[in-house]
C-alpha cells in the first residue's frame, strides 16, 4: 500500500487501449476513471483525463475516496474531469479508521478540508457518496454529524450506499431499511438500491 503519487501506467499506453476500444464500439455513455486502487494516486491523472476528453465527446468521470484531496495538485487535476464522485464515509478520525482504514499519516480533518475546498472550486458535476455501515456510522447521532458536514460542501447529488459486495471484514453488515430511510430523509440523499439476501452481492 502507498499514499505516494506515482505513474503506475503510462498515459500513452492507456490512451492506446482506449483508441482501440473506440474502433470496436461507441456504445457507452461515460468514461469512468477508477483504477485498480485509488485513481488520484496516479501522478499522471490530470494528463490522462485531458487526453481522454480529447478523444470523445462523452463525459469523463473520476471516482475517488477523496483521501488525497488535501493536495492542491490533485484538486487541480480533478478539475479537468466532467464529473467527480468522491466519498465521505466518516465524520471524524475514529470513524475514518474503522471504515476507510486510511494509510499512513492521512488525517480526516485534512481530507475533509481538501474535499470542501474542491467542492467550492470545481465547476463540473459532483456526486457525493456516503457509505453507511451497520453499527459504525448509521445511528442517529452519526447521521446528524454528517448533516452538519454536508452544509459545508457544494455538490449536485448525494448517494447513500451500504456494503453489497464482500467487504474486507466479515462482520461488516448492511444497514437496516429503517436506518437507511432515516438517513435519506435527514440528509436529502438518494439510496442506492440494496439487493441482499443474507450475502453481499450487486448487479
Region locations from a protein language model:
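Canonical Radical SAM [4Fe-4S] cluster-binding loop centered on the CxxxCxxC motif
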Residues: 1-13
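Short amphipathic alpha-helical segments at helix-loop
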Residues: 2-3, 33, 96-99
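Short Fe-S-cluster ligation motifs
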Residues: 13-36, 195
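Class I S-adenosyl-L-methionine
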Residues: 19, 53, 151, 181-188
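Conserved AdoMet/S-adenosylmethionine-binding subsite of the radical SAM
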Residues: 40-175
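Short acidic, glycine/proline-enriched helix-loop-strand junctions
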Residues: 128, 168-200
Amino acid at each position: 500500500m502507498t499514499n505516494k503519487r506515482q505513474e503506475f501506467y503510462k498515459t500513452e499506453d492507456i490512451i492506446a487501449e482506449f483508441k482501440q476500444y473506440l474502433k470496436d464500439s461507441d456504445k457507452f455513455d461515460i468514461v469512468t476513471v477508477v483504477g485498480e486502487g485509488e485513481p488520484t494516486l496516479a501522478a499522471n491523472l490530470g494528463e490522462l483525463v485531458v487526453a481522454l476528453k480529447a478523444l470523445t465527446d462523452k463525459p469523463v468521470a473520476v471516482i475517488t475516496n477523496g483521501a488525497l484531496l488535501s493536495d492542491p495538485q490533485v484538486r487541480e487535476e480533478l478539475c479537468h474531469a466532467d464529473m467527480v464522485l468522491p466519498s465521505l464515509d466518516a465524520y471524524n478520525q475514529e470513524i475514518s479508521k474503522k471504515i476507510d482504514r486510511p494509510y499512513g499519516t492521512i488525517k480526516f480533518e485534512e481530507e475533509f478540508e481538501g474535499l470542501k475546498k474542491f467542492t467550492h472550486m470545481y465547476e463540473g458535476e459532483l456526486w457525493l457518496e456516503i457509505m453507511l455501515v451497520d453499527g459504525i456510522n448509521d445511528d442517529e447521532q452519526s447521521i446528524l454529524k454528517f448533516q452538519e458536514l454536508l452544509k459545508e460542501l457544494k455538490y449536485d447529488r448525494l448517494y447513500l450506499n451500504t456494503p453489497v459486495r464482500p467487504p474486507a471484514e466479515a462482520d461488516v453488515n448492511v444497514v437496516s431499511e429503517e436506518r437507511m430511510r432515516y438517513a435519506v430523509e435527514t440528509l436529502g440523499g438518494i439510496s442506492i438500491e440494496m439487493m441482499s439476501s443474507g450475502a453481499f452481492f450487486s448487479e
